[in-house]
């Protein structure tokens, strides 16, 4: 990838700069430490961080020591990984996976294999092959676009996700099984036999050209950093001699591809277990220090797609002044094309370009017939890299052989090249308060980028470009200029002229005024002068006082926010709307917040759908009503069913009626939706009646809810056949172990003669109520069609009652259905289930 090579190039360029006495060195200085973070309930530690107050520049020293400090502490909150997983399987680590992956023959719990730990046997293994493609783990690493380096693994490349997808190896000798996180994987070797050769009259030109080709947001924010993956040769004396010079560049490059891959969409990716743990440990109160540590370990992005292979790139440099004296000019003057330089690897030579390279060789201090450069190589055996640092002008076959040796090793030791990236915050999921943490990680990455904004640097002279490298600022100089501040040399040609302006850093955000905050910046780093260009962009910026996304999450997930930040005053439930409802309605809404109304299916809202909670705790509601648009059938049809079944029917549509359960229909069998939005004939004229039979069939036995009918007999259900049911704590008396069950499962295990006793809810950790999507609503909630999520039912809306149980509410026991109890719990009311059957008084009647 070009970004990485540019990162390494800057390190290479920095090695050949010298800091002139004309610019006084500026040493890096740390700012004071910030406050300690909240004590982490999992690690029992807290951290604090200090930022750079003054970046080192002009040869000054970098900051010493770490930006972070850690100490042990006593947490006030528990560890999120100790919580339950609802209806999913919980690995020993705390990570949750789908129950469909349990006992399928594949260890989908990445670190402990708990999903296969207690399986007596696996009747049908999900696949007959378990070998993944070689080096597949490379596709799951994080990536830091600021440093240009790969980081720790963020995607679980070992999980097959219960799938059996195979791919044939490139050499046709073997099959491999693909990870469930891989969308596509192809073994296709691509070797470009034609090398690419490019001349640049300065490192400045090279950076400008390559960043323009990248055309990405990070072209300037993420191009500059030290890298330890480069290989250089030459003594300290040679480096000191060359630091006082300005250079031209010849870049020779090529790539080798072994395989191509595309990762799945983020919502379908299973994150690596160590990364998942770190996400779980992140605080729900924004603390940049904690999120910054995650960025340091796992990067800013993850791999969306790319190739496994190797990249060969060598930079050859020539002193600009010597080149001018000896007649070696830029490619515009001597016009050596890529084809003209093939003589470096083939026997056919171009004398004009040979002379050009001989000039470069002599001016850059190379002796004999060897042309030395700086190899920037990714992939392949590192033992071959030293041989790639030079070209023998008299032995093109030897040059090609050394390259071929390295290229041949790429199949064994590939790296990811030609990668496409996606933001890391997309992978924040399957942890408590994931939506809040995702928003905070996005904010932290933006703040991290700001740390490397060149606005922190002092201006470079002669139009040089200031860049941030770790805790130091460096100047990238224009052609024929050099020095620590680019103060030496002379600008020539179209580079000469005035000084363009540069932005200073943004100010802090102002206090909140009329619902908005503002900040500003100045074009004075440096200010434009001598007809130089002014800065592009705005001098001021404004935003809402409260992040709208954060405010929405504060309502949907109030448990994710510190109690001191919670609103203190609320309006009661908003007024009801006939044939309509409030989207995402809670029991209480904070002052200043708004709710939005919507209409039932078959109705359209006329008027202003927004109501606001006023400061007087009264609802400010405009005129609105729901207007009927179609014919609607009632929810209860007394044994009748309709075909086709639809939420509503437009004018002219017909519906056919029939009866269920051996009943026969009396009255009209077909209804028409008329122009008045009424059924013709009327639905009340149709009804279902019992058929007269001479010999009624023998009645099937009436099974209990925890039983099922099999071969005309009632037998006990299995626990996995239970549907939606309330969670309770139960003690297994045979093992004296307390665990979480549901009311349905307790009835089932009792049916199987297992001795389980109901205990208090404080005796175990019950699964936290997770937000459900439509299609998975429990019996005490219903689907909100507007946002596709489940909301609490009203007590009168219970369609499936569940078991009759004994519940203590406000200190008094009463018998109610699971649905009724679930509605109370859904609405936040504290209840205690004292018996899984009706209360003793009612049971005795």
Swiss-Prot record:
Description of activity control: Membrane attack complex (MAC) assembly is inhibited by CD59, thereby protecting self-cells from damage during complement activation. MAC assembly is also inhibited by clusterin (CLU) chaperones that inhibit polymerization of C9.
Region spans: CCP 1: 545-615
Top-level lineage group: Eukaryota
Subcellular location(s) of the protein: Secreted; Target cell membrane
Domain LDL-receptor class A positions: 84-120
A GO BP entry: complement activation, classical pathway
Annotated Sushi domain residues: 569-628, 629-690
GO cellular component: extracellular region; membrane attack complex; plasma membrane
Glycosylation sites: 124, 201, 755
Coarse class of the protein's main subcellular location: secreted
Region (Factor I module (FIM) 1) location: 695-771
Signal peptide: 1-22
Cysteine pairings via disulfide bonds: 28-63, 39-73, 42-79, 85-96, 91-109, 103-119, 127-164, 336-353, 433-560, 455-505, 457-473, 460-475, 477-486, 512-545, 523-535, 571-613, 599-626, 631-673, 659-688, 703-714, 716-751, 722-744, 729-764, 774-783, 777-790, 792-826, 798-819, 806-839
Region entry Factor I module (FIM) 2, spans: 772-844
Nucleotide-binding as UniProt keyword: no
Annotated keywords: Complement pathway, Cytolysis, Disulfide bond, EGF-like domain, Glycoprotein, Immunity, Innate immunity, Membrane, Membrane attack complex, Repeat, Secreted, Signal, Sushi, Target cell membrane, Target membrane
Region span, CCP 2: 616-693
MACPF domain location: 122-456
UniProt domain TSP type-1: residue ranges: 27-80, 500-549
PROSITE patterns per record: EGF_1, EGF_2, LDLRA_1, LDLRA_2, MACPF_1, MACPF_2, SUSHI, TSP1
InterPro entries associated with the record: C7_FIM2_N, C7_KAZAL, FacI_MAC, Kazal_3, LDL_receptor-like_sf, LDLR_class-A_CS, LDrepeatLR_classA_rpt, MAC_perforin
Subunit description: Monomer or dimer; as a C5b-7 complex it can also form multimeric rosettes. Component of the membrane attack complex (MAC), composed of complement C5b, C6, C7, C8A, C8B, C8G and multiple copies of the pore-forming subunit C9.
Protein name: Complement component C7
Organism: Mus musculus (Mouse)
